[in-house]
């Protein structure tokens, strides 16, 4: 076993590799992957891995040998605090898993379609920035899943949190939390307001008589035996809300880009969904901006996509392969551990680069080609397909996200022609959640 650090670029004597990495992140990773192999160092505490087996090892050892990313204000005690959170978080996952499975098994199909219709009806016929529109949809969908009739205002808080986090996602150095920079103050202010709102909602629901069956995930969490603390319930809600907001929105933005580039694919998806009933709504009938979508906005059930949608599902799987929103997953070593032939120290970061694994010709035929048909036979080996991670921290809402993305893909193709003149030029942006940068589109009602 080698006790030295993995090899890697030395970089600038003062700034290391930060400047070169920020110029073109994926080009930096590709170049040094070719030069140093599947494991290489970025600096003396950070290692990249593009090896599927080692990546699978790291992800499946999370909670034991590793913890998940520590966040923008991680201090000296953050590693210990993250370890302390493992047990309550894993218990919360066990509590909500059955409810999420029910939601994925078409339990929310009608509402997902109704929410998407309401959001897109507000913007139809106008040139719009696609990512904020998809964030609006995903925010309403996950807020309703978690909080049901108490979801009012939550999508707006999720949008504010997303905006407050963006500066951190594009930065390689973070000022300590106590430094009163505008970026820090904004993040702390928005996050505090969100957590205070969730805390009030949890306390108010706790004071109500228990509902059977539970209406939403908050009811499920409050009905756990033994009882969860309000703090644990609030933290769990927050984690699910954030995970169900940014990732589906980024994936849908990539899907919209493909629908604009590939009209034949869009037509095939529309055929699979079947014709929508009724005419396109008039401008006056659309919900006002910012209004929560209502159940009355839903079309007749038979008009919406439903049941198995194999082509739409294959398109989603292929988008998640080519453009995984969680394109890089960070784990932090809890103790001294080994990564292949290398030894890591407590606090060392391992960056698992799903994007490059998904496009590696060793694991995928024609890896850079968009080919939904590959999913008719594809059976990815462990560690080679990681849109939702792996191991004990595999995305809790993966099945819900797949159903939501499949329905949304089908519904957009069924109702709209997507016109996006900059679709080809809107390349993925490798910071935070991977999505086409600056994609603009017009959703035109189909004829």
Give the residues covered by each predicted segment.
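Cytochrome P450 catalytic-core helices
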Residues: 245-272, 398-416
């Amino acid at each position: 076993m080698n006790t030295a650090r993995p090899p890697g670029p030395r970089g600038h004597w003062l700034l290391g590799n930060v400047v070169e990495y920020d110029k073109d992140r994926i080009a930096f990773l590709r170049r040094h992957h070719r030069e140093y192999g599947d494991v290489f160092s970025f600096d003396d505490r950070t290692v990249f891995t593009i090896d599927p087996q080692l990546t699978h090892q790291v992800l499946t050892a999370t909670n034991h040998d590793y913890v998940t990313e520590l966040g923008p204000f991680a201090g000296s005690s953050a590693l210990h605090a993250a370890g302390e959170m493992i047990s309550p978080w894993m218990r919360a996952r066990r509590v909500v898993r059955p409810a999420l499975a029910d939601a994925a098994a078409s339990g929310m199909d009608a509402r997902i379609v109704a929410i998407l219709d309401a959001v897109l009806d507000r913007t139809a016929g106008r040139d719009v920035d696609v990512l904020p529109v998809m964030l609006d949809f995903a925010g309403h969908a996950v807020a309703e899943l978690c909080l049901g009739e108490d979801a009012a205002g939550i999508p707006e808080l999720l949008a504010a949190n997303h905006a407050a986090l963006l500066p951190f996602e594009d930065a390689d150095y973070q000022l300590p939390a106590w430094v009163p920079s505008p970026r820090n103050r904004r993040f702390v202010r928005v996050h505090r307001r969100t957590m205070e709102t969730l805390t009030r909602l949890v306390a108010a629901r706790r004071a109500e008589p228990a509902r059977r069956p539970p209406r939403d995930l908050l009811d499920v969490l409050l009905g756990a035996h033994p009882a969860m603390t309000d703090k644990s319930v609030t933290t769990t809600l927050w984690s699910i809300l954030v995970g169900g907001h940014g990732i589906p929105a980024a994936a849908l933005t990539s899907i919209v880009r493909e629908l604009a580039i590939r009209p034949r694919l869009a037509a095939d998806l529309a055929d699979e969904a079947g014709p929508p009933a009724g005419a396109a709504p008039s401008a006056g009938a659309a919900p006002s901006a910012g209004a929560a979508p209502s159940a009355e906005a839903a079309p007749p059930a038979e008009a919406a996509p439903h049941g198995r949608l194999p082509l739409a599902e294959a398109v989603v799987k292929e988008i998640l392969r080519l453009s995984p929103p969680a394109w890089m997953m960070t784990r932090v070593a809890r103790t001294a551990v080994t990564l292949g032939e290398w030894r890591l120290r407590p606090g060392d970061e391992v960056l698992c680069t799903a994007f490059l694994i998904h496009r590696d010709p060793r694991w995928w035929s024609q890896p850079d080609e968009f080919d939904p048909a590959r999913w008719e036979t594809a059976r990815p080996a462990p560690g080679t397909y990681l849109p939702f991670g792996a191991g004990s921290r595999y995305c809790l809402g993966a099945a819900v996200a797949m159903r939501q993305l499949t329905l949304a893909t089908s519904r957009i193709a069924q109702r709209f022609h997507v016109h996006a003149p900059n679709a080809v030029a809107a390349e993925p942006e490798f910071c935070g959640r991977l999505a086409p940068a600056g994609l603009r589109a017009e959703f035109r009602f189909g004829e």
